[in-house]
């Protein structure tokens, strides 16, 4: 996976947090059998920054834990027609994942597990959204959460 990591926090992300993100993105990409040159970005930020994004793009004026912006969706009106051979040679850019480190701390304390577990959960959750998984319908929720749990367990971040 070709991962771009951005740290917009005021305190600075710890090296082990950044490594956790790299490892989980790689593992999730392997689990989904994505090409090695698949691109994704993860941005760490605080509650104030993610609240502004949540308000601007979702109309919800409060901080959230994770927001994913998929580069591609299933809307055929947005499809760009290109030579299939050329498309196969280009890396796939999945999109962007934004995570509130404040929410990581808050939710880890509330759920009584480690911040690493919470950060890992949000990384994988956001990554699966970028790959078309959602949890709006019960069957879809079961599929997404089962895959999420498998990836986290395989990495050693069991609940």
UniProtKB/Swiss-Prot annotation:
Details of cofactor binding: Binds 1 zinc ion.
InterPro entries from the UniProt entry: MetalPrtase_cat_dom_sf_prd, YbeY, YbeY_CS
Subcellular location: Cytoplasm
Main location: cytoplasm
GO biological process: rRNA processing
A Pfam family assignment: YbeY
Cofactor(s) essential for the protein: Zn(2+)
Cellular component GO terms, alphabetical: cytoplasm
GO MF terms, alphabetically ordered: metalloendopeptidase activity; RNA endonuclease activity; zinc ion binding
Alphabetized SUPFAM superfamilies for the sequence: Metalloproteases ('zincins'), catalytic domain (SSF55486)
Residues that, per the record, bind Zn(2+): 125, 129, 135
EC number: 3.1.-.-
Keyword set, alphabetical order: Cytoplasm, Endonuclease, Hydrolase, Metal-binding, Nuclease, Ribosome biogenesis, rRNA processing, Zinc
Classification via HAMAP family: Endoribonucl_YbeY (MF_00009)
UniProt similarity note: Belongs to the endoribonuclease YbeY family.
Functional summary from the UniProt entry: Single strand-specific metallo-endoribonuclease involved in late-stage 70S ribosome quality control and in maturation of the 3' terminus of the 16S rRNA.
Name the record gives this protein: Endoribonuclease YbeY
The species this protein was found in: Lactiplantibacillus plantarum (strain ATCC BAA-793 / NCIMB 8826 / WCFS1)
